[in-house]
Amino acid sequence: MAETEALSKLREDFRMQNKSVFILGASGETGRVLLKEILEQGLFSKVTLIGRRKLTFDEEAYKNVNQEVVDFEKLDDYASAFQGHDVGFCCLGTTRGKAGAEGFARVDRDYVLKSAELAKAGGCKHFNLLSSKGADKSSNFLYLQVKGEVEAKVEELKFDRYSVFRPGVXLCDRQESRPGEWLVRKFFGSLPDSWASGHSVPVVTVVRAMLNNVVRPRDKQMELLENKAIHDLGKAHGSLKP
């Protein structure tokens, strides 16, 4: 499809399909902003959060958000939580510093993969995975290796549509402080846009890229969006090319 379509028209057409969505990792920075944008855009008829604890919201806009509390160590016991969703967004993730090497791999690979398997079995058609710039299953760095491994494993599940997002350093104000991240964000925030955009990206831009992508017609089963593509798609306002 060569011609561009108005983004507003794509969103409206998508809303008319009354699709349901689940979010994994809604308590994290990206998941939190993603939920906010989903509700503001009104793209889905049903929104479900799947997590290890119930989240508390004061705003009226969140009153119809469904929540499924699961034990990620026993996900097979919670298969019903993953049933009946058209679209899924996975923003699960921790760090080696917080969870240790084994704990990091457990969350970022094992939990993500098992969740994807249950989502596929439950009827999910479009699975969106938040990964990382430089993800490579052959990498010597554990973080990038695990990210690359889970990307490949989820692809093997053969979702009707599978979108992988590889942002650079996420520019945000975390509710949870991680040592060194403030300094990194400050560094990238002071660089010229042309250089910083190749290595960093605001969380809200990542989220908007995810949602702009979900409403546009797919042109292939597996989509891999690197940092520059995330910037371009996340800043689109008027039109999109599929």
From Swiss-Prot:
It comes from Pan paniscus (Pygmy chimpanzee). Its main location: cytoplasm. NADPH binds at S27, G28, E29, T30, R52, R53, L92, G93, Y143, K147, R178. The lineage of its organism: Eukaryota, Metazoa, Chordata, Craniata, Vertebrata. The keyword Disulfide bond applies. The active site is at Y143, K147. Monomer. Forms homodimers during oxidative stress. Interacts (via N-terminus) with elongation factor EEF1A1 (via middle-region); the interaction is direct and competes with EEF1A1 binding to guanyl-nucleotide exchange factor EEF1B2, thereby inhibiting GDP for GTP exchange and reactivation of EEF1A1. Interacts with nuclear transport receptors XPO4, IPO5/RANBP5, IPO7, IPO9 and KPNB1 as well as GCN1L1/GCN1 and LRPPRC probably through their HEAT repeats. Binds NCOA5/CIA. SUPFAM superfamilies: NAD(P)-binding Rossmann-fold domains (SSF51735). Keywords: Acetylation, Cytoplasm, Disulfide bond, NADP, Translation regulation, Tumor suppressor. GO terms for molecular function: NAD binding; oxidoreductase activity, acting on the aldehyde or oxo group of donors, NAD or NADP as acceptor. GO terms for biological process: alpha-amino acid biosynthetic process; angiogenesis; apoptotic process; cell differentiation; import into nucleus. The modification N-acetylalanine is found at A2. This is Protein HTATIP2. One of its GO terms (cellular component) is nuclear envelope. Pfam families: NAD_binding_10. It is found in: Cytoplasm. Residues 2-25 are annotated as: Required for interaction with elongation factor EEF1A1. Represses translation by preventing reactivation of elongation factor eEF1A. May also inhibit nuclear import by competing with nuclear import substrates for binding to a subset of nuclear transport receptors. Has additionally been proposed to act as a redox sensor involved in cellular oxidative stress surveillance.
